[in-house]
Amino acid sequence: MTDHADPLAPRLLTCDVLFTGMGGAQSPGGVVVVGGTVAATGDPAALRASYPHAREEAVGGVIAPPPVNAHTHLDMSRYEFTALPYFRWIPEVVVPQREKRSVEAALHGADTLRDLGSGGVGDIVYMHAPEVMDALLAREDLSGVLYYEALGTFPDRADDSFRTIRERLERWRRLERPGGPRVGLSPHTPHTVSHRLMRLLCDYAAGEGLPLQIHVAEHPAEQELYTRGGGPIWDNRLAPFYPETFAEVIGRAPEPGLTPVRYLDELGVLNARPTLIHMVNVTPDDIVRVARAGSAVVTCPRSNHHLECGVFPWAAFAAAGIEVALGTDSVASGGSLDVREDVAFARTLHPTLDPRVIVRAAVKGGHRVLGSRAPFIRRGEAWNEAYLWR
């Protein structure tokens, strides 16, 4: 009989899904832990046979390295959660509460991620609060990528905007340190960044090896914007911040069959292999273009549901071999910064999708988006109770 008081007595932890950080996940799974060290992983039945004296603990759920929050907005962590259609949510929620976007809010969000034991973060730093970047770069308990957000719909102002953004990025990159957050760039969306600025930013990022994130194909109303140049997004825009027509923003006439993904591809932006956020309302041709470019995508299941965006076509992206990661988006639209809640919600949205695929995406997919590496749960490695997703 195993002595429960013996610190070297083996424990057999069994779960519904095990992902060790290598290969694919398995279900069910188990981990044998001896004295704070992983002794074995694998099928529970095989582990019972190999370690008959181990004390078994049915922990259920998931055993895996901590999940990565691959897309969020930490400086919105003091916003109130509000569910509204996407095209109303920005003018009615984001803009009126913009005074809440601050260093204090971002640090509060970073504290929350630390307390959650997050495996890393892809954070969008608000363009008009650059001091947030300085504050987050200094955090020693934060890893991942801090993407400086760029907006600007007027093509004739693109060069001046680009110079300012480049100067800031170059200063921040000098503050990077081993093990700390990296600096990235996020041209907000194809319809809030002019064609000229979008191309300048993405060409620069590609040349400098800067990680990129772009919000793309989030809401169904984007289809009307790119095919007709109008619709709810255009009707609810903040008019002083836009030229007279949408055609001026994208540098071409809207037309039937034009999608945000096709527009970015034909503009040359996908050559920079940006990570594409949301990608809910896409066509089969869009998916082919993304796969050909080698871009990864991040899905934010709860946020997409709350903003009435639709359901991410996960199976189609998986079939095309596209890397998928998960993010919470901001607390204002997602509800919390705990990406494990998005994993659980994704399992309800995609009942026919193997849950092992979703767990792997939350870990391996997130690390691949951020250019980092997940810790491994394997023989000889230190055991961490944070590997139990509760």
Where in the sequence are the language-model features?
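N-terminal metal-binding scaffold of metallo-dependent hydrolase/deaminase domains
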Residues: 1-50, 372, 388
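Histidine-centered catalytic micro-motifs
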Residues: 65-77, 211-220
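Active-site gating loops and adjacent loop-to-helix segments of metal-dependent hydrolytic enzymes
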Residues: 77-105, 145-148, 220-271, 346
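Active-site glycine- and acidic-residue-rich loops that bind
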Residues: 125, 186-202, 216, 220, ...
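Glycine-enriched alpha-helix->loop->beta-strand junction motifs that scaffold or abut catalytic
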Residues: 140-144, 204-211, 269-272, 289-298, ...
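His/Asp/Glu-enriched, well-ordered alpha-helical/loop segment
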Residues: 233, 266-270, 312-390
